[in-house]
Every structure is written in C-alpha cells, then in structure tokens.
Amino acid sequence: MTSDDIARSVPSRSVETCSALTPEQTEAVLELLAEAARIDGQQAVSEQGRIQLRHSGGGGREGVSHLLLTVGGELVGYAQLEDTDPVEAPAAELVVHPSHRGHGHGRALGTALLAASGKRLRVWAHGGHSAARHLAQVLGLTLFRELRQMRMPLTGLDLPDPVFPAGVTVRTFVPGQDDAAWLAVNAAAFAHHPEQGSLTQRDLDDRMAEPWFDPAGFFLAEREGELVGFHWTKVHAEERLGEVYVLGVRPGVQGGGLGKALTTVGLRYLAAQGLPTAMLYVDADNKAAVSVYERLGFTTYETDLMYRTET
C-alpha cells in the first residue's frame, strides 16, 4: 500500500477486477511496479504477488484477483487480492503510479478492495510509509502485524563452525527428487504461518523457475534419511544481497540447535558468493527469533505493516 489518500472526483477513473490478465495488461502492471520501485526504493508488491502476476494469463490463479485502475484508458494503479486462506481475511497489496499520486486513486483502489473482499480485508504497507498508514486509517483498517526486514554485514564474517545434533547430515536440494519431502516439512514447520505453510508443488515450481533459483544454496538437513530441517537461501544479484529466504525445522526436532547450525551454513554460503550483506524477514512479535538473529549480528532495516478490518 502506497501513498495517495486524497479523495477527489476523477470522472474518467475506473477500476476493473480481473481473474486473469492479458500479456499486455501484465506487462503494463510490471512497468508500473518497476517505476514505483525506482521512485520508492522498494517493491510495493511482494515476491509472491509478482509471481502470481507473471503467471496471471490463461485461467489465472484460483483465489487471486487483479484490480486495474485506469484514468482515460491509462493504467495508473494496481491491486492484487488473494483469497486462499480458509481462516484469515483476503490479503491485498496495492500501488499507484508515482506520477499520479495525490488524486484519490489509492482510496479508490482500497474501496474497491473492501467491496471485492466483502469488507473482510488485510492490506500490506511495505515500508510502513506515513501516507500508507493514513490511507489505512481512512479505510477504517487497524494495524495488527509487523514484519521486520533485518540485515547484517557479511564482509569479514567469522562465524564458528556449525554444530549439528547427533546423526544429522547436510546436503543440497535436488529438484524433482526432494520436492515432496520438502513441501511436507515446510507445511509442518510453518503450520502456524499460512502464507508459507500452504505452499504447493505449483508454488515450488514457480520459484524454481525464477532466474535467481540455485539449488547450491538450498540446504537440507537429514537424519537417517529423513528430512528434519532446511535453509533455502536467495541471492538478489542486482542489489548484491543474500537472503535467508526460508529456514525451517520439523516439529519435534526443534530446540537442539539445528536451526542455528543451518543458519550458519547458509550465511557462510552467502558470504562465499562475495555478497556484502545478508537479509531476512521475521515477525516482530516472534521475540525468540528476533533475539537469535540479533545475537548473530542482524539489525532491523525496515518494517512492513499489515492492516485489517475489525473482526
């Protein structure tokens, strides 16, 4: 959710809701997102949202809607609404072209999202900008989640050798061979986190098709041939950032130091790629995880905020 909170009448403005987009519409939205990211210094739509956007042709994705705001036929705003969680309200992200902010387009998109979601809505504000906070207030949304992006320097990194629990060995992910086992452990490790824990084979395939995917940075921990944990890293080549993309430990194996050991393996790998900085995302209310990362040397870089309608 970005700035743009002034409600003014724009006669030529319209909002179209689509379950699937044409290649031309997809390209126009991607260009809008790129320009917004260039001006704002960050993405307005998450990686998951951008993947769903790029795969929005054909019949689209079940539970995913795309809202296109045009003025005089020109695309000036975009929102994505995902209604796939059986419990939580539909989740949305939105953006207005930097050259068209200040004309009520953000509020128009927000109002359309409320209508499309049956007034049960969660909205991300990446970076937590003040204009986004104000728009959330105007729409009657309240803050309920804070997601921290934390970073640490990798230059000169001197981490102790990882110490794994007895019987645990580490190897890298083999696409096509380890898919089912990884999906099962990921679902178990993130049962409390529907966004991550609900990943499907299609979601995994989409990520493996991304240019950044490299199984050499996807580490699996096994005991007696069974997967018990993993650390999937990601390299942001353009920004020269290494990410602790997903780190998970199977329930029942937690508490033995496996998570810390896997973190060390991944950070060492990222440092060996010559990347100067590592990053990760963690919920602010996960005090234990935040404390672990702070002890490793991570500090908060920025915070994404999620707002929702009152339940």
Protein language model regions, located:
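Conserved donor-binding loop and adjoining core beta-sheet/short helix segment
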Residues: 21, 26, 31-117, 122, ...
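Hydrophobic beta-strand residues of extracellular immunoglobulin-like
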Residues: 65-68, 217-220, 264
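Conserved acetyl-CoA-binding loop-helix of GNAT-fold acetyltransferases
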Residues: 102-116, 246-251, 255-272, 290-295
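C-terminal "cap" of GNAT-fold acetyltransferases
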Residues: 149-169, 173, 178, 281-287, ...
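Phosphate-binding active sites in nucleotide-utilizing proteins
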Residues: 190-236, 251
